[in-house]
């Protein structure tokens, strides 16, 4: 298995500098990761630098709380795509999900999917650490109904990250035709292999180089 092609090489810390982001971009070129996952402010830089390379440009929408308005998320998506993003990882409205407002949650996702249609993959971050199992299932079902390409466990900025149990539940819920992304706390090759075995088709990590080289000592967190 080519683990590198399953990894979104990630740098989302608020204090990331241009030098930090360039390092991630160069590593993505060298190791041929699936994508770089960066904050929207770095999308144009990444798109320019990765032109001609088989590495997607992934950014985050409504991140990390998911509490911006649907209109804002849709605008962020269009703006990111205009600057060169080919994948967007959006955060659901977690509070609305917990309120049982399925209509709002679905519309929130749907509007981002429509804004990205034909131009970028949409991954929906459900923030599993804040949800009950019933809420996780409902979030996945609403994501599929709204037309999302992937469901994703975590932002990496809340109280917990991906677990193999959550990945298995998400995979069971969405079926074989929607992607499942594990992110948050995936720092070693063993972690990544566990997630893939549980059903993940993509892994978000900042310790991507250490994962590929199977070097636990090199693992760091840029979430």
Curated annotation (Swiss-Prot):
Annotated compartments: Cytoplasm
EC number(s) per entry: 4.1.2.4
CDD domains the UniProt entry points to: DeoC
Class in the EC hierarchy, top level: lyase
Cross-referenced HAMAP family: DeoC_type1
Main function: Catalyzes a reversible aldol reaction between acetaldehyde and D-glyceraldehyde 3-phosphate to generate 2-deoxy-D-ribose 5-phosphate.
Name of the protein: Deoxyribose-phosphate aldolase
